[in-house]
Amino acid sequence: MAEREVESGPRKRFEQKSGAVFDEIVENCGGIMDTEMSEDIDHNLTPTLDSMSYGMPNQTGSENSLLDEDDYFLNSGDLAGIPVVGSDNEDEQDFSSKDNLVSSIHTDDSLEVERRVTQHESDNENEIQIQNKLKKDFPKQFDQVSVFKSIRKDFSLVRENSKETFSGKEKNRDLTYEREKRLDKPHKDLDSRLKSSFFDKAANQVEETLHTHLPQTPETNFRDSSYPFANKESIGSELGNSFASNIRIKEEPLDDEYDKAMAPQQGLLDKIKDEPDNAQEYSHGQQQKTQEGELKISAVFSVSGSPLAPQLTTGFQPSLASSGMNKMLPSVPATAVRVSCSGCKKILQKGQTAYQRKGSTQLFCSTLCLTGYTVPPARPPPPLTKKTCSSCSKDILNPKDVISAQFENTTTSKDFCSQSCLSTYELKKKPIVTINTNSISTKCSMCQKNAVIRHEVNYQNVVHKLCSDACFSKFRSANNLTMNCCENCGGYCYSGSGQCHMLQIEGQSKKFCSSSCITAYKQKSAKITPCALCKSLRSSAEMIENTNSLGKTELFCSVNCLSAYRVKMVTSAGVQVQCNSCKTSAIPQYHLAMSDGSIRNFCSYSCVVAFQNLFNKPTGMNSSVVPLSQGQVIVSIPTGSTVSAGGGSTSAVSPTSISSSAAAGLQRLAAQSQHVGFARSVVKLKCQHCNRLFATKPELLDYKGKMFQFCGKNCSDEYKKINNVMAMCEYCKIEKIVKETVRFSGADKSFCSEGCKLLYKHDLAKRWGNHCKMCSYCLQTSPKLVQNNLGGKVEEFCCEECMSKYTVLFYQMAKCDACKRQGKLSESLKWRGEMKHFCNLLCILMFCNQQSVCDPPSQNNAANISMVQAASAGPPSLRKDSTPVIANVVSLASAPAAQPTVNSNSVLQGAVPTVTAKIIGDASTQTDALKLPPSQPPRLLKNKALLCKPITQTKATSCKPHTQNKECQTEDTPSQPQIIVVPVPVPVFVPIPLHLYTQYAPVPFGIPVPMPVPMLIPSSMDSEDKVTESIEDIKEKLPTHPFEADLLEMAEMIAEDEEKKTLSQGESQTSEHELFLDTKIFEKDQGSTYSGDLESEAVSTPHSWEEELNHYALKSNAVQEADSELKQFSKGETEQDLEADFPSDSFDPLNKGQGIQARSRTRRRHRDGFPQPRRRGRKKSIVAVEPRSLIQGAFQGCSVSGMTLKYMYGVNAWKNWVQWKNAKEEQGDLKCGGVEQASSSPRSDPLGSTQDHALSQESSEPGCRVRSIKLKEDILSCTFAELSLGLCQFIQEVRRPNGEKYDPDSILYLCLGIQQYLFENGRIDNIFTEPYSRFMIELTKLLKIWEPTILPNGYMFSRIEEEHLWECKQLGAYSPIVLLNTLLFFNTKYFQLKNVTEHLKLSFAHVMRRTRTLKYSTKMTYLRFFPPLQKQESEPDKLTVGKRKRNEDDEVPVGVEMAENTDNPLRCPVRLYEFYLSKCSESVKQRNDVFYLQPERSCVPNSPMWYSTFPIDPGTLDTMLTRILMVREVHEELAKAKSEDSDVELSD
């Protein structure tokens, strides 16, 4: 006894410790696992002991306490009851101690009983101390454990075995106590004894099933019955890795009496009610019941019996490893199963009969609860929680984008946001393991890892081995391979295994790996897709799928279209099909579409009647046939029929009389859908002119209240001509055949031609202004429009109503006028003044067909409709209980003899048959009969008075004799001069007999006869050399164009006439240039004639080209007196060296009195050279033209007007150069027509200047004889050829008196002086024009190298001034080329255009004349230049002014203005530009690509047109611009613009 008490002490302590330990563990683990189960759908419980350590402090302090019996940890059987589930993926386990969670999981009932017994035997103080100690130390000691990851079954097994061991130990010691314990609770002990291996399995299944299928039961067991048991080792080997390798567990001997006590008792077993063991026994009597919806009791069985398990755990049976293991498994106490009635919520006792509804998991205690129970409403779905991508850790907002994947070594699935994240995660998780198979390692071609190869791709004759689907997807993406990939998930579709599914959508065949991907793709994309049969547009998510014989899935809008499609396929195939009535294989003659989309085929009409009789039977006799009340539709397809407008026939579907209103509406909708679908495929319209059928958009004509349809515009026009469709033309006011009718401001306007319509619109634009535009909805023209921004585009409407309608149409909320379907309407039609909108062309055809049919209403149709309504409106009592039957069946093939032909003919002919219904009891029969239209009523005749009056007509006969004229004169009056006959010797061939080659025959022989040739020989020429020289001069002087030659010839004649006049007639007269400069004369003439008009300006300008020529022709002051000429040269002898008299160092514009008017700042110039606007609100400036005061000349030899150009410098330089040239000619150094080098040493001329050797050339034309010429010192006496050749040599050989070369600006100054001298002395030659082209080329080459000189005082120096060009008539309106030169000068100076490219960008559209009102009501006229918009890229020929680069968005090109010159109108740029416009053609004044035009070669001064429509040659423009860039004022303006740009940059 003492020993037993000693042993019982440790056992008590062990039970106290183990009870406290596992109470705490179960509560902590249960709370966490309850939370995890609520989050995990698969109920995968997660371990909670990862963060706990298993080392416990020893109570006694001994090192070998683990081997002692007192160690409660190793010997505790309750340790195996810890509900821990091992996870294969250790990365997901992140747990901590959760003491604050309230556990909602109840432990097993056996654990509660054991704990209750332990508490009675233990001391309260020891229990409180042990529990406090364990609560303090237990969480800390289980921090480092990592091997407690076995499945719950493992711990249950250890727990039950240990309990059995301890039960055997206390068998011999406390037998009396155990017997009393069993007597206190007989039901528990009895249930334990009844447990066998079969009952153990059933009890576990019941427990698991209740946990899975009965969520309302409060008890929950966490044992996974589906876990496959294996052969487990002992507790020491199972937990040995967790503690130590040398742990030994104390083994106790088993007691055989305990097993005998636990054996079942036979007496108690006989008292238990036997229940059926399987579902076949209790459901055997239920198979005969066929009425759907009838209450069925699926099972009746005991609550605690074994048959409950197979009913609740179908497909959820555990697999046992061996039969011996069942003996080792302990029995589960029956008290763990507590089932309550779903109706009254009472607890079902053991052995009580329970009832279960078929297909439901709920149990009921009686049939009363079973019949009175109503299904509770479904719980609202839990709020969607945001899922996180396992790869990139981003929240997946859209649940449709979630990709769940389950890996090989885990039972849980992971979520990913995209396929790329899934592939990345797989690569990260894929271990780098070398797999050696027969010492051969295979490497993946994508990830370069040694792994098992799953795919091999032969690409470009190279086999690529891939280890996974992710690598296979990457390989396809990298090489742009369009292989069999699923459109939804991107996976590979193995077409060889039959897993590849095809979907026909949007005209393309898309591949899918499974039917679920097809459904997901339809739901995800939800595209508007046309039906495969009727082509109506529906969302793909709402359409019905059907897979045809080729394996392609097609989409249909309704079951009706699907049925019709199947009928069409069966009909077109022509194969033999089994009849649904007689089961005979034959070609089907009749088809019936059922409500479920299936097709019933019949071989004859008798089979149809037999099949129809099946539906006349009472309900319940045959449940395999779907009743027609669910909405059958009889499909009739008229083969070869065509729906035509204008009296054509339409195919109709006979309506089916049905019992309920809902079914009637369904059938009516189905019949209408079928009718629309088939009519669309065959509908055609009939042209009113050519009577042809067409299926295109019709051409409509609204005439006399009717709409006429035509197949095209030609038929419409021909119909108008034939039927005289005439109306008053709105423009020409003549009644003609209507060509087009357009709506203006709500009224229809008719026009006879396209030209009248355009002219009328042009007149409206003038009256209404620029707002004469068209409404975007009704297409009518209105003066007032309402604007609205739709889709980023501004639309204009005539009224608010049109704007609202267009808005509804734009947002696809409008309905089609034909099919009444809402959506995108892409077609429109104007029908009787209203705009109709349609889905597509088919809807237009349907609408026009319906309108044409509905226009002439038929009495026959009206009668039929009324009869149908009367027949359907029968007694409601009879129609309520009747069963609908098949109304009509139509054959698709030829009608057999047994078929009634009345119905089929009525349908094929398009007539609407009358419907008569005969109702007999529960069955009804409906027949269709064709009723002929009633005969027309007799015509009413009335008396009518007739008044007949003959039409008389008077006929008159007029006789008139026919007269003829005949000449009978006797005297011959010669009307033409007599022809003098001149004998001309003509050789005549006289034929003679041929003597067969034996005699000589005459042969024609030509004799030259001299003929007189007229030649023009000048009488003043005495020698041959002079004649040849004159001829060559004439050839060189005369231009190639005949009109220009006539003009020059006239000018020479005028000059010769002036030279012949005597000196007495050369009195002092006011020269032309004095008139040009005389301010009083100008004010007298110009001020009174200027009116601003272009034509009056051209006439009133006193110095036009025409007046210039007339003035030279009339005046006679060309020849001056000899003494005055000598005096002039004597006075001009001082003007010898230009550069010496005007050195650049002494230049000062202020001292010269050149009062330059202050000019407002111009716009800064952009990169492209055009002026650009300033920012910060600076006011626009106007370029003012600076008038110059006319300075009186201080030098002698100039005109009396005091011009600043001293032309005597040029004259003297020419004279000195000619003297040097003639001196060399006398020495034989110069020859005409050859090129010869002079002496290498410089020579001194008689004036003391040394001239260098130069090249001399006269003419390069062939036939020119080499001869020597002598230039004249008097430039006025030089001919055109001499002047042209001399100027070419002059600019190259002229030197200063000291022998130095002239600067380029000085040479141009001398040439301008020569030009001015020629004009002053009556010569109209302009040496800067095309006849002197050789001289112009050489001069341009010389001036190109010149750059302006910057003086130390900051001024720019150039000897060429603006005034010089005005004086020598290079600026003005004297000729077309001079006027172009003037415009070029103004644009260069004031618009800062410095190269040819910038000038070529000018156009008439960019230069406009404007007027502005100034102070004191004065008006100012100016020219505004709008620079064109420039592109981003820079061109090489653009000159950038300014250092700062601005963005194009910051600057908008603004026009630069140039004001008129009111001080001197002859130099006004505005007036000159207007005169230029007056001489241009009207066709070029609005062009935006040309400004400088080519002068006409044949024009005269009084010609209305000076310029052609072609732009001037860029080479000519470059020659003119080179001379303009020599002007000092031009460079000053450019420098000012550049300095202003710098100031703007500094201010910014």
Curated annotation (Swiss-Prot):
Keyword annotations of the record: Acetylation, Isopeptide bond, Metal-binding, Phosphoprotein, Repeat, Ubl conjugation, Zinc, Zinc-finger
Record's compositionally biased regions (Basic and acidic residues): 1124-1134
Per UniProt, location of the Glycyl lysine isopeptide (Lys-Gly) (interchain with G-Cter in SUMO1) cross-link in this chain: 250
Regions of compositional bias (Polar residues) in chain numbering: 1237-1260
Residues the record lists as N-acetylalanine modifications: 2
A biological process term (GO) from this entry: regulation of cell morphogenesis
SMART domains: TRASH (SM00746)
Modified residues (Phosphoserine): 110, 122, 162, 197, 242, 1030, 1064, 1071, 1181, 1256, 1539, 1542, 1547
Region called Disordered, residue ranges: 162-189, 1124-1183, 1231-1260
Cross-link (Glycyl lysine isopeptide (Lys-Gly) (interchain with G-Cter in SUMO2)): 140, 149, 195, 201, 232, 250, 260, 271, 273, 289, 327, 400, 428, 430, 1035, 1061, 1080, 1127, 1431
Hydrolase is among the record's keywords: no
Alphabetized InterPro entries for the sequence: DUF3504 (IPR021893), TRASH_dom (IPR011017), Znf_MYM (IPR010507), ZnF_MYMT-QRICH1 (IPR051284)
Phosphothreonine found at: 107
Positions annotated as zinc finger (MYM-type): 362-402, 414-457, 464-499, 510-544, 554-592, 600-631, 708-742, 749-788, 795-829
Molecular function GO labels: DNA binding; zinc ion binding
Tissue-by-tissue expression: Expressed at higher level in heart, skeletal muscle, kidney and liver.
Start-end of Basic residues biased regions: 1160-1181
PANTHER family in the record: ZINC FINGER MYM-TYPE PROTEIN, ZINC FINGER MYM-TYPE PROTEIN 4
Leftover remarks: The 3'-UTR region of the mRNA encoding this protein contains a motif called CDIR (for cell death inhibiting RNA) that binds HNRPD/AUF1 and HSPB1/HSP27. It is able to inhibit interferon-gamma induced apoptosis.
Function: Plays a role in the regulation of cell morphology and cytoskeletal organization.
Name of the protein described by the UniProt record: Zinc finger MYM-type protein 4
Gene field: ZMYM4
